[in-house]
């Protein structure tokens, strides 16, 4: 899934302006490449009501999109400078205080996906 691959490559755990720089670049990349792809795939999978895998495909895309918007909101909420751009002052950082909440949200999404997949398998 896009969300897990993005998290693994984002460097979210570090508290530095370089981390925010990487997150901002990743969010920009997601907005330009992944999000349109997700919208297209979600549109296609959610329009196939007769398909036996309709629910899972649609749900999976919705979770990915929600994660993207949640992460964008999180980064902007926890930075000193709310309008992120690629040239960041050195005092901008992601606060580690809310990191457990982010991890909790990700684990919750993984659990929901696992349960949903197992209940709609086959």
Swiss-Prot record:
Keywords for this protein: Glycoprotein, Signal
Lineage of the species this protein comes from: Eukaryota, Fungi, Dikarya, Ascomycota, Saccharomycotina
Signal sequence coordinates: 1-18
Protein name as annotated: Putative uncharacterized protein YJR071W
Domain of life, per lineage: Eukaryota
Organism: Saccharomyces cerevisiae (strain ATCC 204508 / S288c) (Baker's yeast)
Record: glycosylation sites: 15
């Amino acid at each position: 899934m896009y969300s897990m691959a993005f998290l693994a490559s984002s460097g979210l755990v570090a508290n530095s302006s370089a981390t925010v720089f990487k997150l901002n670049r990743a969010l920009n990349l997601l907005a330009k490449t992944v999000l349109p792809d997700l919208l297209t795939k979600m549109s296609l999978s959610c329009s196939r009501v007769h398909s036996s895998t309709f629910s899972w495909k649609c749900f999976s895309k919705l979770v990915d999109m929600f994660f993207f918007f949640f992460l964008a909101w999180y980064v902007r909420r926890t930075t000193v400078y709310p309008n992120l751009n690629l040239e960041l002052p050195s005092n901008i950082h992601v606060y580690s205080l809310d990191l457990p909440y982010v991890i909790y949200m990700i684990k919750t999404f993984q659990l929901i996906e696992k349960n949903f997949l197992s209940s709609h398998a086959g």
